Swiss-Prot record:
Pfam families: YozE_SAM_like (PF06855). InterPro entries: UPF0346, YozE_SAM-like, YozE_SAM-like_sf. This is UPF0346 protein M28_Spy0369. Belongs to the UPF0346 family.
Length: 83
């Protein structure tokens, strides 16, 4: 089962980093209305565009999403190796 985007993003938190993923993770951490239990790109993208209490470059979000998907693929491959 795929980790929610929020769960994965929280593993990327690093207040000392200027990396876009770390910045987004810190912003989302402080946003109490962020959709935490989904991995639906459209829902999260619309939220960031229309409802988030902060602004973030959506082009960077697209890149972060691709990284999230890549990590999900790697995690899935690793779980198959356990069997």
């Amino acid at each position: 089962m795929r980790k929610s985007f929020y769960s994965w993003l929280m593993t990327q938190r690093n207040p000392k980093s200027n990396a876009p993923v770390a910045i987004l993770a810190d912003l989302v951490f402080d946003d109490t209305t962020f959709p935490k239990h989904t991995n639906d790109f459209e829902l999260i993208s619309r939220y960031l565009e229309d409802q988030a209490s902060f602004s973030f470059n959506l082009g960077q979000f697209d890149e972060i999403w691709e990284d999230y998907l890549a990590h999900q693929y790697v995690d899935k491959k690793e779980s198959y190796r356990l069997f």
